[in-house]
């Protein structure tokens, strides 16, 4: 079997799908994207495609090493996202050829279900509370929400109080009947993170995500030393080498590699194993589409330390398409009591509605994240 063609489809809301075709008619799907940089990743995919056409798709490990090591300059969000989507598609092909789900090819199940959590948006506490009530009705009891809006490098007590007030009202409304993580989104400087984390501790959030930017990872162990709240990070780390430094330094309790950013299934399985050796748990980052989610689920079901799975159903970014709009076998992604079951169809287990993908790709938006500014007109972290 040989790879004959690679096609990319930019799609709403901010996704990109990839299709790898073979000379025997077996097709694999992947999801390579950096949100807001889809065209750049698309160019990288097709550059890497020069290494792949005519090659045997079953040699996943070798092809991964070729894509990573054949270029003198390597790594980073663009190239690793391109590799990630290609890697997903190669695993999809292998599973289809062998008539087996990917998790079976990786040694079989380590659990029977994985807890999912849902993002809850809203600018005011009442909106967040209403959103949680709706999601609880369909089985969710674990959520993630913004921990704050933009904060100055050194900000005032009013800004801190506003962030804490939202969390306080949520905990008061639901008590210990729900769990929620708070996403700082890298918006908070190290000095302000110390202040905000201390103020949030009484409300017992499940975790605090990206308390500072990944570029400031040296602060993770320092922040962890002052709090009992687990710290989470990883969506802006792109290889096992990035994660190695964080694991060695300590401070992070929950790693959040993104299966569409950090080298795909092949690389993230290695990252999961590294994390387990440090007694660090895994909760793959996934505010993306169904192929990315499927890849995450296969890692969840073969990684002992996987504890939570993010998913984008109903997320505020999903304008123009919802999580399962391009999926034929929607029922396989059904959650029971807030848990996903293993996908059982061969490969990644996602049956893509290709005609719909082609149609929607004709008018795909070029999504960009907002540009925020502080009161003094300097650029703020989004």
From Swiss-Prot:
InterPro entries: DgoD-like, Enolase-like_C_sf, Enolase-like_N, Enolase_C-like, Galactonate_deHydtase, Mandel_Rmase/mucon_lact_enz_CS, Mandelate_racemase_C, Mandelate_racemase_N_dom. Binds 1 Mg(2+) ion per subunit. The record marks 258 as: Increases basicity of active site His. It catalyses: D-galactonate = 2-dehydro-3-deoxy-D-galactonate + H2O. Its cofactor is Mg(2+). It holds the Pfam family MR_MLE_N. The active site is at residues 185, 285. Transmembrane segments: none annotated. The record marks 310 as: Transition state stabilizer. GO terms for biological process: amino acid catabolic process; D-galactonate catabolic process. Mg(2+) binds at residues 183, 209, 235. Its EC number is 4.2.1.6. GO terms for molecular function: galactonate dehydratase activity; magnesium ion binding. Belongs to the mandelate racemase/muconate lactonizing enzyme family. GalD subfamily. HAMAP family: Galacton_dehydrat (MF_01289). Reaction proceeds via an anti dehydration. NCBIfam families: PRK14017.1. This is D-galactonate dehydratase 1. It comes from Escherichia coli (strain SMS-3-5 / SECEC). The lineage of its organism: Bacteria, Pseudomonadati, Pseudomonadota, Gammaproteobacteria, Enterobacterales.
């Amino acid at each position: 079997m040989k790879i004959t063609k690679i096609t990319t489809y930019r799609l709403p809301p901010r996704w990109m799908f990839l299709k790898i075709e073979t000379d025997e008619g077996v097709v694999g799907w992947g999801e390579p994207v950096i949100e807001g940089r889809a065209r750049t990743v698309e160019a990288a995919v097709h550059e890497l495609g020069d290494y792949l056409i005519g090659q045997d798709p079953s040699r996943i490990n070798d092809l991964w090493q070729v894509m990573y090591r054949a270029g003198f300059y390597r790594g980073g969000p663009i190239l690793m996202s391109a590799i990630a989507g290609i890697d997903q598609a190669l695993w999809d092909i292998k599973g289809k050829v062998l008539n087996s789900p990917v998790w079976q090819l990786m040694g079989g199940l380590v659990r029977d279900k994985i807890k999912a959590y849902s993002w809850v948006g809203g600018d005011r506490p009442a909106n967040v509370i209403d959103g949680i009530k709706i999601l609880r009705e369909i089985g969710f009891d674990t959520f993630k929400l913004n921990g704050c809006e933009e904060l100055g490098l050194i900000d005032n007590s009013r800004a801190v109080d506003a962030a804490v007030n939202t969390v306080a009202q949520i905990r008061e409304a639901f008590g210990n009947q729900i769990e929620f993580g708070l996403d700082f989104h890298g918006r908070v400087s190290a000095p302000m993170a110390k202040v905000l984390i201390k103020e949030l501790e009484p409300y017992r959030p499940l975790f605090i995500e990206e308390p500072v930017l990944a570029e400031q990872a040296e602060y993770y162990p320092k922040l962890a030393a002052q709090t009992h709240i687990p710290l989470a990070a990883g969506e802006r780390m792109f290889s096992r080498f990035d994660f190695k430094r964080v694991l060695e330094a300590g401070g992070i309790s929950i790693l959040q590699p993104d299966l569409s950013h950090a080298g795909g299934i092949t690389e993230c399985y290695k990252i999961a194993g590294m994390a387990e050796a440090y007694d660090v748990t895994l909760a793959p980052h996934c505010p993306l589409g169904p192929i990315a989610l499927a890849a995450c689920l296969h890692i969840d079901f073969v990684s002992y330390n996987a504890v939570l799975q993010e998913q984008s159903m109903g997320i505020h970014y999903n304008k123009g398409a919802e999580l399962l709009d391009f999926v034929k076998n929607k029922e396989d992604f059904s959650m029971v009591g807030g848990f996903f079951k293993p996908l059982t169809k061969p490969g990644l287990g996602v049956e893509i509605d290709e005609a719909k993908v082609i149609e929607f790709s004709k008018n795909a938006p070029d999504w960009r994240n907002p540009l925020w500014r502080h009161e003094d007109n300097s650029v703020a972290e989004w």
